[in-house]
Amino acid sequence: MLENIRDAVRKFLTGSTPYEKAVDEFIKELQKSLISSDVNVKLVFSLTAKIKERLNKEKPPSVLERKEWFISIVYDELSKLFGGDKEPNVNPTKLPFIIMLVGVQGSGKTTTAGKLAYFYKRRGYKVGLVAADVYRPAAYDQLLQLGNQIGVPVYGEPNNQNAIEIAKKGVDTFVKNKMDIIIVDTAGRHGYGEETKLLEEMKEIYEALKPDDVILVIDASIGQKAYDLASRFHQASPIGSIIITKMDGTAKGGGALSAVAATGATIKFIGTGEKIDELEIFNAKRYVSRILGMGDIESILEKVKGLEEYEKIQKKMEDVMEGKGKLTLRDVYAQIMALRKMGPLSKVLQHIPGLGVMLPTPSEDQLKLGEEKIRRWLAALNSMTYKELENPSIIDKSRMRRIAEGSGLEVEDVRELLEWYNNMNKLLKMVKRRRGSIDKLFGGKIG
């Protein structure tokens, strides 16, 4: 899936096919790639319908080309498909912190227990592993081998068939030894299709241990079948989260991820390889960036981020116009940094008042002048203290000299910035509550 979609993005952005035709071709390739990755057909067509709806309803911001804007919509909607902005919390909320792993046979649960232990050990926690999978003869030996490999102690009783008893003893032992995180590897004797028995066993061990987190381990190769298992687990264990393993070895990883995300369950980690350190905190946006080709879309995402930051500053200016608060030099700094992310000066300088480049098509000399002015202003702002940025009225002549010396500028440069800032605040008060004033002030909306 990754290669096909990545190639489609590159072809779309660099090809000479007319825009409308290129969009249709891209959407067809996206549908084909997602379905071949075992993403549910209904989810796929719902996704592409949303993309088309946004194309018809929304207008591209001026800082993005039409093709860039389209890819930013694809990025946004794909991110939602795989879980959106939901950020998993991987930090323990208390110590000791008990994690219980559950999963069917073959899901990679025991290997994941070792990876998880290594993940937390690298973060400075004292970790203990409990081998409570009594149904698979090799489970204890495997966990012991992993523990020795990463220097983490393992508690197990190879001759005891009582999983609950082993789990309780193991947890008690590690609590006495002042371990920070205790990971319990429970039985995985049931195959897919026997989820009811798996969840019943999970509840029994849960009642005995009262763990702080229950994690269901799912093999990515089951694709969209993950929906039923994840859904039932999510309903049975409100504190639970999910790890999807073997993402590197199957074409169905996208299907498993989208299926789990559709249940509302939290995907905490994904396994990206066989090595002990190949466990990655799951982030939907980062995953989608990888699908689309980070190198191809990085500049687009940077522009979108700049636009979002700019809109926050614009909202602050509207508040100032309404008499709520005052614009600070910190806001000015944030505004300039946001505009710099949005692309060439020929597109964005006209949106900053007072730079002398307010013409629709600034000349090359005007652009150079504006660019130099921005460079000087940023240097001055970077030389100011927190108090000066928040309250510019305290900047007297001696402070101006210090700022100028610290930034390699003349005092006149600092004075010019402060005069512009004061004029800006006066102008904002003058146009208070007047509809469209912010657009006049900025020479036209960016979005």
UniProtKB/Swiss-Prot annotation:
EC number(s) given by UniProt: 3.6.5.4
Family annotation (SUPFAM superfamilies): Domain of the SRP/SRP receptor G-proteins (SSF47364), P-loop containing nucleoside triphosphate hydrolases (SSF52540), Signal peptide-binding domain (SSF47446)
Pfam families: SRP54 (PF00448), SRP54_N (PF02881), SRP_SPB (PF02978)
Localization terms from the record: Cytoplasm
Alphabetized SMART domains for the sequence: AAA (SM00382), SRP54 (SM00962), SRP54_N (SM00963)
Catalytic reactions on record: GTP + H2O = GDP + phosphate + H(+)
Amino acids binding GTP: 103-110, 185-189, 245-248
Listed GO biological process terms: SRP-dependent cotranslational protein targeting to membrane
InterPro entries named in the record: AAA+_ATPase, P-loop_NTPase, Signal_recog_part_SRP54_M_sf, Signal_recog_particl_SRP54_hlx, Signal_recog_particle_SRP54_M, SRP/SRP_N, SRP54, SRP54_GTPase_dom
Assigned GO CC terms: signal recognition particle
Keyword check for DNA-binding: no
Protein task: Involved in targeting and insertion of nascent membrane proteins into the cytoplasmic membrane. Binds to the hydrophobic signal sequence of the ribosome-nascent chain (RNC) as it emerges from the ribosomes. The SRP-RNC complex is then targeted to the cytoplasmic membrane where it interacts with the SRP receptor FtsY.
Domain notes: Composed of three domains: the N-terminal N domain, which is responsible for interactions with the ribosome, the central G domain, which binds GTP, and the C-terminal M domain, which binds the RNA and the signal sequence of the RNC.
PANTHER family named among the record's database cross-references: SIGNAL RECOGNITION PARTICLE 54K PROTEIN SRP54 (PTHR11564), SIGNAL RECOGNITION PARTICLE SUBUNIT SRP54 (PTHR11564:SF5)
Family, per entry: Belongs to the GTP-binding SRP family. SRP54 subfamily.
Protein name, entry field: Signal recognition particle 54 kDa protein
Taxonomic source organism: Saccharolobus islandicus (strain Y.G.57.14 / Yellowstone #1) (Sulfolobus islandicus)
